Amino acid sequence: MKYKILIFILIFSQFTRGQVFTNYVDNSNLNIKKAVDFYKQYLSEFKANSLPEYSKYWPKNDCERFTTPDPIVYSIASDYPTYNFGSKKTIFYAREYSDYIHLKTLMTQTDSLENIHVYAITNHYVSLNNKTDQIYFISPLKINSKLYKIKKKGNITYHFPKTHKFNKSKSNKLIKAIKKFETDWGFKPIKFDYYFTNTQDELGAMKGLEYFYGMEQTFPSGMAFPEDKIIYCNSCGEDYLHEVLHLYLNPLYENSPINHGLIYYLGGSLGHNFDHLINKMNDYLMKYPDTNLSMFETLETKDITLHINHTVVGLICKIIDEKDGINGLKRLLKYKNFDLLFQNEFSIEKKDWDMFLKQNFKKYSDLNNK
């Protein structure tokens, strides 16, 4: 999770359609020039409200398998293309190999005070076939595949560094949790790919990034892409249930204000279960007693490892689950707004949400600590 992303998008998105600089590469090499021109055309198609036609740039097999065949596109944020960050893109490295051209790009933005903000350093691999004149990108996941192992367990295909010793116990724990969720909620099994590494740096490298905004974070995190049935995560090993639940719930409930909080409740977040998040929120409220939870939908957190909105919604899910079980949780997912939810489920007005929520966070935190 990258909670500050939207702030930077709002500040800088108006500047993102900028120039691509190629002064550092050897444009006298015709193959390099061809690859650079191809790449520049690709970048130009990432506009404010549109994406490229991937079939023009990526192999047919990749486009048939993936809605987004480029693993770099949604690496900084899951809903905003990496290539739209920063107005200045500098291709500073171009090297020809026997079957492809390797390009490195620095993506930056300079603010009004001449401060340079670095968003990403990317690696792209352009395949050139001089006999057929075909040109296309090779996925970093394919280029880097020799560095990773693949292991299938149940419906999960794991991809992870060769240096990592696979933890069967954690994998079995995840499979057990998935099967219970499928049974309880009536979902059919899903086959999916699970890419994981021990750190953000390693995950970035797997996807073709030497650097990306937020890479310095050390806590567990991940992203899920239900359309492609893929999850990427770091620092949490073989059993990150949170992202897996997105594969099941997002296709049906992504627009529900309850969805992400429900996933917090069922799958925890940042490597911790929901009881830990309750305790963390209760501690946060004691540290910042002026926090008004009646405004939880729009509150900015002072702790980037605590998402107030999702944790509050998770608490609501816990209360309803204890009262009405899964049918109650399914009922919550039908609500379009929280005003109606609080009126129908708890018979309270917005001015009273703060007291109600704080009392329940304290109640459950006290129970957890007994």
Role assignments for model-derived ranges:
Residues 148-255:
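Juxtacatalytic substrate-recognition/specificity segment
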Residues 29-37, 48, 164-175, 231-239, ...:
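Soluble non-cytosolic domains of exported or imported proteins
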Residues 36-40, 171-178, 241-245, 260-264, ...:
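Extracytoplasmic/secreted envelope proteins and their assembly/folding machinery
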Residues 16-149:
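N-terminal low-structure segments adjacent to metalloprotease catalytic domains
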Residues 42-46, 177-185, 320, 342:
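Hydrophobic, Leu/Ile/Phe/Ala-enriched alpha-helical segments that form helix-helix packing faces
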Residues 1-23:
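Bacterial Sec-dependent N-terminal signal peptides
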Residues 79-110, 235, 239-244, 248, ...:
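Short N-terminal secondary-structure initiator segments
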Residues 252-370:
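Acidic/His/Gly-enriched intrinsically disordered linker/tail segments
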